[in-house]
Amino acid sequence: KAAKDAGATVAPAHTERYYQEVTIPRGKKLKKAKEHELVLESDVFINVPILKTHNSTTLTIAMKNLMGNIWDRGFWHRNGLHQCIADFVSHRKPDLNIVDAYRVMRRNGPRGVSTNDVALMKYQIISDDIVATDAAATKIFGKEIDQIKHIDIAGKLGYGVDDLSKLNIRRLKV
């Protein structure tokens, strides 16, 4: 309702007919997936994940957020979730990733059980490199990249930069 009231177009995603099969040629476990047609038809793809913990992947950041564009996420969970996430990144990377880490779910993600699970962090991470985006966001939780398997896999496969020392990072204080 809020989106419609603000003038946004709300796209349906509740039935399989809105998804088209894509092949993942470089995929190790994920060879194909059904991706939402509006993502496939877009000229520019901007990924805006909310940083949070997740019981299956430790963290949800930019790469994990792409699962929201997929019809059969259950396949990923049954067939090596971290590898499938990394495989999908080889298909099409967003043009821009903007991680909302203003209020961060620090525990009990992805849904949380109380407001005590959320902390005010006041961060935003912006990059055109999805692996670098996720690598930087892991530091907010004090994690190393190799602790989040899909980030480690994607970095090792060359899908982006996972070594923060190789990046030109600009920190802005507002």
Positions of the model-derived regions?
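N-terminal and secondary-structure boundary signal
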Residues: K1-V174
